[in-house]
Amino acid sequence: MATKAPNDLNKLFYGDNLDVLRNSIADESVDLVYLDPPFNSNRNYSLLFKEKSGDQSQAQLEAFDDTWTWSHESETAYVEILKSAAPNQVKDALEAMRKLLGDNDVLAYLVMMTQRLLELHRVLNATGALYLHCDPTASHYLKIVLDAIFGGDNFRNEIIWQRTGSKGYQTRRLPNNHDVILGYQKSPASKWQLDAAFLAYDLNNLDPKTAGKYSQRDPDGRRYSLTDLTGPNDPRPNLTYEVMGVTRRWRWSRERMDEAIAQSLVIQPKPGGVPRYKRYLDDQRGKPLGDVWTDIAPLNSQAAERLGYPTQKPLKLLERLIALTTEEGDVVLDPFCGCGTTVDAAQRLGRKWIGIDITTLSVDLTDARLRHTYGEQIRDTYEMLGIPRD
């Protein structure tokens, strides 16, 4: 268990994230964990790490080879969890899945993930949250593990991100065009930024319902709706008074009403009619964000931010998650940081960050990305730890 005190520098670690978490990340020192681990879906990206000489680091190869097999190392890790101080429900869940699945690649993947998720839970603040990005081949198993570690009551959302359009005709099933992001809070005190949970209206492309509700326009084109100003059955006498020749029980005090009238926000639709409030569309928070995200496009080969990294996610996706769950100055941790999208998003939003990856290629790519985006001076704001140098 790490007890080192954090400093003000961001950190980019080269190494096995399990070792880094255990030895270098203190308890309750992180506000948000986002992880996009290798999916157990038989995809192989290991060729990415071949050097021009043809040599490969075995650690790098195994780190990004998206196929997991049950081995002596898997058995050792499984026994370690059962003998550890992990909650009994975690041990029960793993034992049950071993009975269900047998000693196969799926179980090996789940054991590897359980070790790391236990450590990630430890390093999270009580006000923190974790979001795990996966695909449907493993999401149902991972949710069992997360429920056991965080508690089912701390499950927040299963976010569906549509990462591609239809992949064409499938003979015996529908094509898979989405990823899953499982969100958990550390406790009911975990942060949630409500203002970030709305999508700004596209005033040039409104859905029919919103366009119908805000159908009226000012001469300058601003859309608005007229809403009721009369109040509920509130007995307070100061809410009953005359406005524009009409006496009613109103929602607001006289002072607030006069202020709105002075701002031309209260109008009388017709002579003698009940005054109403002008609610402008562009003053509203926006459309509430749901748990199916279709508005963030995947990166295609022409995308300006694309780095050629096979599992690179859009910057906008990470910016949204960070904005929803953290405040400026909070610490964001990505234990599978890949090409550095999470740390880039955290940097843009004024958060501190920790990135970990087991491949030198990923760590060097993240370093280069940050320096290219923010200038060489950014290098003074973070440490690179564990990098082997000649």
Please describe what each predicted stretch is.
Residues M1-D367, H372-E376:
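Core catalytic lobe of class I
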Residues T381-D390:
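Post-kinase regulatory C-tail/linker adjacent to protein kinase catalytic domains
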